[in-house]
Each structure stands twice: as C-alpha cells, then as structure tokens.
C-alpha cells in the first residue's frame, strides 16, 4: 500500500501524538523570498498587488494569503525580484550567517532558491560556488542566478567528490541540501509517497553521508557547514 512504510514509522516514532498531529488543521502555505540584490523586503511588500504575511522563518520571506495565486507569472518574478520558495526552505541559508567577502559553497544547489539567498548575503562581494550534479538542473540553476542578478557566482556541474578535490579546505561557509527521501513532498506529490520505502531511505542516507564527507573536505579550518 502506498505510504504504508512511512505511516508505520510515524506511528512508531510519535505514539499517541500521531492522532493529535493529523487531527490538527494543516493548510498548505506557499511563500516567496525577496531577492536582497534587487530590493528590500519592505519595498517589495509595498509594491506588489497581492496579499502577503510576514514569514516566521526568514526576514526576507513572506507567506501568500491567496492559495490560488500564481506568483511565478508576475513581472517581478521574471525580473528576479523574488523567488517562489517553500516557507521552510528559506531557513537554512540564514543559519550560515554569510557576510560579504566570504567564500561560500552551495554543494547541492539546483534549482537555486537557497543559492540566491546566499548571493544576497554576499552583496556581490566574495565568491559563491553553486554546484548541480544533474546537467539539466544545473542549467536551471544558472538561469535562475542570472535572473536574480548574481554576478559573483561560479556554477558547476560536477560530482561532490570532484568539487572537494578542486577546493580543498577552501570555503568559509558551505550549505549542503543533500538529496533526500522526499517526505516534505508528500502533500504536493502523491508519487513521492508511493515511491517511499525503507530501501530509499537507506540509499539517501548513504548518499548524504558521502556528500557530507566531501563538503567537510572543502571547508576551511574553523569554517561553518550547514547540512
């Protein structure tokens, strides 16, 4: 049965809290993150013609009040003023505390939402290396960074091992959003639930551990890594 393994694991981990969790209303919230290279969040909120609420996850992000809105069609999106991003996805980049002038690596960067946040924090100073292992997704990454006005980024299409070999102990900050078993996609993608299994979880865990080793090799002593 689709999702049988996942439900069994949830029940085992949550116990009596499982029923409480699923009894609570759980509306899907969609969000956008403002590109600090284009404008300030306050300027964006004052300029757009659709409803927004401040996001609890990121100062540069907003929640959409209209679930039917298609922000990707807005002119400001095409101009790189904002990025359509899951609200929770706006969190990791901010944890690194990136500052202008630093050397930053986004090791699993495609399609580029978190990468654009790192770029905004750099303010055009320093170096941002963004890697996408799948060629087609690396192309999307490149396109998105161009749209967002990022000028100090190097986009790669390499294995994480080759990136680590090319940049030993080099980066001040590294973000690793490794491929995962996709539980966060279940509400939007029924196929993700159907494909979920213990074998997939084990496979993703092994891959994540390997990528994390490569990331550590590229981090300078005293640097900061967010996984």
PLM region spans:
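S-adenosylmethionine
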Residues: 1-227
């Amino acid at each position: 049965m689709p999702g049988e393994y996942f439900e069994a694991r949830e029940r085992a981990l949550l116990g009596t809290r499982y029923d409480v969790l699923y009894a609570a209303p759980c509306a899907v919230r969609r969000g956008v993150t403002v590109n600090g290279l284009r404008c300030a969040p306050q300027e964006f909120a004052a300029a757009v013609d659709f409803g927004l609420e401040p996001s609890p996850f990121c100062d540069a992000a907003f929640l959409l009040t209209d679930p039917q809105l298609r922000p990707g069609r807005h002119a400001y999106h095409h101009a790189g003023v904002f990025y359509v991003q899951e609200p929770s996805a706006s969190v990791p980049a901010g944890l690194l505390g990136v500052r202008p002038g630093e050397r930053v690596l986004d090791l699993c960067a495609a399609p580029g939402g978190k990468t654009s946040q790192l770029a905004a924090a750099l303010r055009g100073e320093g170096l941002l290396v963004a890697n996408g292992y799948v060629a087609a997704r690396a192309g999307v990454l490149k396109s998105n960074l161009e749209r967002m006005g990022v000028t100090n980024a190097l986009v790669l299409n390499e294995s994480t091992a080759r990136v680590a070999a090319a940049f030993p102990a080099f980066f001040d900050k590294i973000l690793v959003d490794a491929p995962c078993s996709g539980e966060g996609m279940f509400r939007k993608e029924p196929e993700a639930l159907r494909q979920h299994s213990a074998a997939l979880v084990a496979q993703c865990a092994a891959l994540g551990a390997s990528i994390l080793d490569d990331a550590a090799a590229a981090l300078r002593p005293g640097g900061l890594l967010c996984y």
